[in-house]
Amino acid sequence: SWLNMKYMYPDYKNGLVNVTCSIEKYFGASYKHKTNALLDEILSKQNNKNVVLFLFDGLGYNILKEYKDKCKFLYEHLIGDISSNFPSTTMSARTTVESGLTPIEHGWLGWDMYFKDFDEVITLTKNVIKGTKTKAADFHVAKTYLKYEPVTDKINKMDGRIGKTLRVYSNHPNESLRKMKRSIKKLTKNKEKVYVYAYYNEPDHALHHNGVGSD
């Protein structure tokens, strides 16, 4: 039962933020936290021109283990596990990967958040009052109050470097992983050193609908 479950605490020395800091280090950008030693070693040995980071929302170590027969390629190439954030929400984790900052630094903690200045709960990405289509303000509240610089933007400012963010959502009919793959192939043919951050909202989207124990 849940009473016998082991408490899991975030490890900010072997977590999402450290992976991102390793990528920043590899591209010569500034970074705020300890890097991931294993990833540092791989990047230095390979010395590849490009780095592509895929973030499959909700595909944690336990889910990957549970469905290893359906994710054979990923499981067979697994070299270790890392910790997520606290809170381990999509918004918190995704923003950490995109910024190289911990949740207490970037402040994007969940899909909806209360803002004292407005006395409203605001849906961050949509910039609307929760549960309505009413705009929270005539400016983007979260991007103003919780401003951060994406890693891809930092890399883009550097000579001979390209940083690009790609996002695909399974519930958006005009988007697909196939299109994302084509975009990545095109980007990595540049003569510059390229970092591509590619986000996909599965299996999180399916897990919300069907539960973590579903097929």
Predicted region positions:
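Short acidic, Gly/Ser-rich segments with clustered Asp/Glu that frequently serve as metal-coordination loops
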Residues: 58-62
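His/Asp/Glu-rich, glycine-adjacent segments
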Residues: 1-36, 66-211
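Charged helix-capping and loop-helix junction motifs
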Residues: 214-215
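A short, charged/proline- and glycine-enriched loop
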Residues: 47-49
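Short hydrophobic beta-strand that contains or immediately precedes a catalytic carboxylate
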Residues: 53-56
